[in-house]
Amino acid sequence: MHCPFCGEADTKVIDSRLVAEGDQVRRRRECLSCRERFTTFETAELVMPRVVKQDGTRQPFDEEKLRAGIMKALEKRPVSIEEIDAALNRIKYRLRSTGEREVKSMQLGEEVMTELRQLDKVAYVRFASVYRSFQDINEFKEEIERLSQGNGDTAVDVARALVDNGTDKGKA
């Protein structure tokens, strides 16, 4: 690897460590010419499947677009960047592990909803309302009732969290 300081091609690895839960290798290097030290990160190049939109068009997987959608749903919610990054990594892992070269945008949306359901119920309902194009309040009620089933929350608890998010009480 070329030295970023002097451009010399001869460098040696001083230290290597696994980082990012073993998905990345951090290497500390030293230039044999100028003796400057620098750090590099090595990750496997994994190809993400192309996304097939509802109208049939195909486009490359765009992690930043996915992140922006999740961040929008989680706006003003008490979820850390680390939790968001972990959710993104799980989504990407599941998409890659299908072995398919293409994935429908609908499947991608369902993967996002699966992660948001675990991260934050308010964000989940926000995303679901846009993703499923809710037309009236009854669709919100039905989704809140589905969300509250099986996890001990009542529909009132989830609805209260949604309402409180718009007031000073619920802002994080």
Curated annotation (Swiss-Prot):
Pfam families cross-referenced by the UniProt entry: ATP-cone (PF03477), Zn_ribbon_NrdR (PF22811)
Cofactor, how bound (note): Binds 1 zinc ion.
UniProt KW Transcription regulation keyword: yes
GO molecular function: ATP binding; DNA binding; zinc ion binding
Domain ATP-cone: residue ranges: 49-139
Tree of life domain: Bacteria
Alphabetical UniProt keywords: ATP-binding, DNA-binding, Metal-binding, Nucleotide-binding, Repressor, Transcription, Transcription regulation, Zinc, Zinc-finger
Cofactors named for this entry: Zn(2+)
Zinc finger (unnamed): 3-34
GO process terms (BP): negative regulation of DNA-templated transcription
Bilayer-crossing regions: none
Keyword Disulfide bond on entry: no
HAMAP family assigned: NrdR
Family recorded in the similarity comment: Belongs to the NrdR family.
Described function: Negatively regulates transcription of bacterial ribonucleotide reductase nrd genes and operons by binding to NrdR-boxes.
UniProt protein name: Transcriptional repressor NrdR
Species classification: Bacteria, Pseudomonadati, Pseudomonadota, Gammaproteobacteria, Pseudomonadales
